[in-house]
Amino acid sequence: MSDKKTVKVTLVKSLIGRIESHRACARGLGLKKLNQTVEVLDTPENRGMINKISFLVKCEG
């Protein structure tokens, strides 16, 4: 798995009061709590979810 590219995603804003599709994108990326960081594969599907909630998350790599 070391040959595949990954992206670190951190949830920096709360999901309280957000629409359901934004909450679903965060859950799909594995983000549950504020300031939680997960490492996901750099795929078009994950990039789309990150793009949809870009105002809630911080990306690295």
From Swiss-Prot:
<comment type="similarity">
    <text>Belongs to the universal ribosomal protein uL30 family.</text>
</comment>
<keyword id="KW-0687">Ribonucleoprotein</keyword>
<dbReference type="GO" id="GO:0003735">
    <property type="term" value="F:structural constituent of ribosome"/>
</dbReference>
<comment type="subunit">
    <text>Part of the 50S ribosomal subunit.</text>
</comment>
<dbReference type="Pfam" id="PF00327">
    <property type="entry name" value="Ribosomal_L30"/>
</dbReference>
<dbReference type="GO" id="GO:0022625">
    <property type="term" value="C:cytosolic large ribosomal subunit"/>
</dbReference>
<protein>
    <recommendedName>
        <fullName>Large ribosomal subunit protein uL30</fullName>
    </recommendedName>
</protein>
<keyword id="KW-0689">Ribosomal protein</keyword>
<dbReference type="InterPro" id="IPR005996">
    <property type="entry name" value="Ribosomal_uL30_bac-type"/>
</dbReference>
<dbReference type="InterPro" id="IPR016082">
    <property type="entry name" value="Ribosomal_uL30_ferredoxin-like"/>
</dbReference>
<dbReference type="GO" id="GO:0006412">
    <property type="term" value="P:translation"/>
</dbReference>
<dbReference type="InterPro" id="IPR036919">
    <property type="entry name" value="Ribo_uL30_ferredoxin-like_sf"/>
</dbReference>
